[in-house]
Amino acid sequence: MTNRNFRQIINLLDLRWQRRVPVIHQTETAECGLACLAMICGHFGKNIDLIYLRRKFNLSARGATLAGINGIAEQLGMATRALSLELDELRVLKTPCILHWDFSHFVVLVSVKRNRYVLHDPARGIRYISREEMSRYFTGVALEVWPGSEFQSETLQTRISLRSLINSIYGIKRTLAKIFCLSVVIEAINLLMPVGTQLVMDHAIPAGDRGLLTLISAALMFFILLKAATSTLRAWSSLVMSTLINVQWQSGLFDHLLRLPLAFFERRKLGDIQSRFDSLDTLRATFTTSVIGFIMDSIMVVGVCVMMLLYGGYLTWIVLCFTTIYIFIRLVTYGNYRQISEECLVREARAASYFMETLYGIATVKIQGMVGIRGAHWLNMKIDAINSGIKLTRMDLLFGGINTFVTACDQIVILWLGAGLVIDNQMTIGMFVAFSSFRGQFSERVASLTSFLLQLRIMSLHNERIADIALHEKEEKKPEIEIVADMGPISLETNGLSYRYDSQSAPIFSALSLSVAPGESVAITGASGAGKTTLMKVLCGLFEPDSGRVLINGIDIRQIGINNYHRMIACVMQDDRLFSGSIRENICGFAEEMDEEWMVECARASHIHDVIMNMPMGYETLIGELGEGLSGGQKQRIFIARALYRKPGILFMDEATSALDSESEHFVNVAIKNMNITRVIIAHRETTLRTVDRVISI
């Protein structure tokens, strides 16, 4: 047997009192199955995160079946057994295992204790379920999962290194060096202050030497003024560093976010993306306010400890003993603290997503009489988030109380022992006062150091959340060839195009080949759900096909570069949106230089010019992101005008005239046809189909 095989067998042995099941929250709306597998793998020693699983197993936004989860588990080296069982039989399951929950979700059953069931829910965290609730939501299907013969204990997690983040900031090293030097001066003064007090009490007062007293006081005043000036300069340098980090980190992450593929956004909620982006602020705040403090606290702990040994001898070991007790308590409770922190972040993000979703659909909410229901659901989510915050605050208060108690006990013991040494003439009063001052600094610095180190561990949580965005591969690849911007009408061709939502599902379309000549108009028809919109997104470069190619003028769009390709085409999709600004800005795409004549011509072609001119402010009329004050047909015509303004070589239209009356639709179709643009449209209306050169059914 090789050493590697022996280590694998040892890793499979459970030699601890109890193996912990980690809590992993799902990021995408339909990856609860992956999260459950990640939790169980972590329990058995294979530490993997959702980023790794998502890359290896491309699941659909529509979710996974139990059979799909079973297949993924086997690829991870796990053995499985699917069971159909009654509620009373849950006690005999090998835990942790996966339960099918409420016919639309998967959770991990951790343990069964009498009539209480402990679940790790990827959507809600740790839950303690009663028998009645379990009976209501458990569907009777479970999946036992345990290490198979090919299972390996390993760590497959994705992180962003702090070094790479720091090196990405221009001017940060020089600023850090300046802050460090200023901090050394401040901390040196802090060490000198108790020495000055000791000199006054042991030399100036007993000798009645006012000259020495004045000299020491003047020196202390000088050091105080120097400390104040240095502290102000350090605060300004910290502000400069914070600004540098804030601008460069946020701009870099936002630019990366905008370049991620569309599928990234379709599988996530906006509130969760916002929450992950906000985690960057938490990292920045921790780095700018705590890293320098951590370095100086470390130096001061050593320096103060040396001073205590010089002044107090064995009393120093008493201080170290009480300090160790506090550190031990913090370390023991760290796991629970991190779990509550993650729970708080996830619940806040869920409430924010629900809030934005409600506002985006406010008209539907009102018409369907859902105001009370949506309000109650949001309130419940917000209360869950607040309760998590209360748990976190409660733990902070507990730690503060423990620190106060330990420090007080330490102070009393040192007072009793130190006073005894003074009485026995083994220590002067000045030395005792100085030692007490050093003891206070030591306890304060160690508590701060412990909090920072644990906070740094908590930062790994924010690191994971940011990594989900920052380490996701961008859709843009470096173009291999240069393309002239204005190419006129463009030919479109596909060769053997195939696409599926994930590796577990059947293809939406397979080996699809079609060609559209320059200036030709083609309509794509088919039954609802046949994949027309998905095909359109593949043709537009929003989705990458599993196989096959999309070519324009005989050139693969991947050679051109997705961004370059998007500059050559225009799309009007079913779910298009307007942005906050004027109608002029929306039609012109918020360009710095706007072509007034061309804008009006595009508005006339989309049959919206007269409507705009009848508005009090004309093209300067302000609209919001939801397009308030405009009908559905008016919005669609503005979308079409916006697409035409780009002077595209190909115009893609997905039910782009579905909200128009027949007269307006006919006018728009004829106007666009006369522009000699290659058109690919999805439509069902006969009036639209009559204006195209060819119809393709899928």
Curated annotation (Swiss-Prot):
Main localisation: membrane
Places the protein is found: Cell membrane
Gene Ontology biological process terms in this record: bacteriocin transport; protein transport; proteolysis
Membrane topology label: Multi-pass membrane protein
Keyword set, alphabetical order: ATP-binding, Bacteriocin transport, Cell membrane, Hydrolase, Membrane, Nucleotide-binding, Plasmid, Protease, Protein transport, Thiol protease, Translocase, Transmembrane, Transmembrane helix, Transport
Alphabetized GO MF terms: ABC-type transporter activity; ATP binding; ATP hydrolysis activity; ATPase-coupled lipid transmembrane transporter activity; cysteine-type peptidase activity
ABC transmembrane type-1 domain: residues covered: 176-458
Cross-referenced InterPro entries: AAA+_ATPase, ABC1_TM_dom, ABC1_TM_sf, ABC_transporter-like_ATP-bd, ABC_transporter-like_CS, CvaB_peptidase, P-loop_NTPase, Peptidase_C39
UniProt EC number: 3.4.22.-, 7.6.2.-
Domain (ABC transporter) ranges: 492-698
Active site: C32
Residue sites binding ATP per the record: G526, A527, S528, G529, A530, G531, K532, T533
Residues annotated as domain Peptidase C39: 26-145
Gene3D superfamilies: ABC transporter type 1, transmembrane domain, Cysteine proteinases, P-loop containing nucleotide triphosphate hydrolases
Transmembrane regions: 33-53, 92-112, 176-196, 211-231, 289-311, 315-334, 412-432
Cellular component terms (Gene Ontology): plasma membrane
Biological role: Involved, in conjunction with CvaA, in the secretion of colicin V.
Stated family: Belongs to the ABC transporter superfamily. Colicin V exporter (TC 3.A.1.110.2) family.
Protein name: Colicin V secretion/processing ATP-binding protein CvaB
Gene designation per UniProt: cvaB
